[in-house]
């Protein structure tokens, strides 16, 4: 697992813990302890990339949450939500790659261009 992927996962688990998902603690602890052992110097650029990953995950979560709860959404609203999620996920991948580039801990992740772009 690349550092960008580990940080991405920690941001998701942190959100789950904040909303009471007790089952997320074990993986969160494992990943945060493993990251701590890397002794990575935190630069402003790295901090910024981490925050952008967390914000992208936050936005994806917010958009998908109404759908998960079964709220009434017409086809146009679902389409709009899916496009927004795709766009935020694209930004998320870019920032995970930036984390890997800055730390030299990981690999560049490539995503296939969606035909709607």
Residue map of PLM features:
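Anionic, Ser/Thr-rich low-complexity intrinsically disordered regions
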Residues: 1-117
């Amino acid at each position: 697992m690349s550092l960008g992927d580990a940080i991405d996962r920690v941001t998701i688990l942190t959100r789950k813990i904040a909303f009471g998902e007790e089952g997320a603690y074990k993986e969160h602890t494992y990943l945060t302890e493993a990251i701590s052992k890397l002794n990575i110097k935190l630069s402003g650029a790295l901090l910024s990339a981490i925050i952008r990953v967390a914000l992208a995950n936050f936005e994806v979560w917010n958009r998908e949450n109404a759908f998960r709860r079964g709220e009434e959404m017409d086809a146009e609203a679902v389409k709009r939500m899916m496009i927004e999620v795709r766009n935020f996920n694209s930004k998320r991948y870019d920032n995970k790659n930036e984390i890997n580039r800055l730390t030299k801990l990981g690999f560049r992740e490539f995503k296939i261009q969606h035909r709607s772009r």
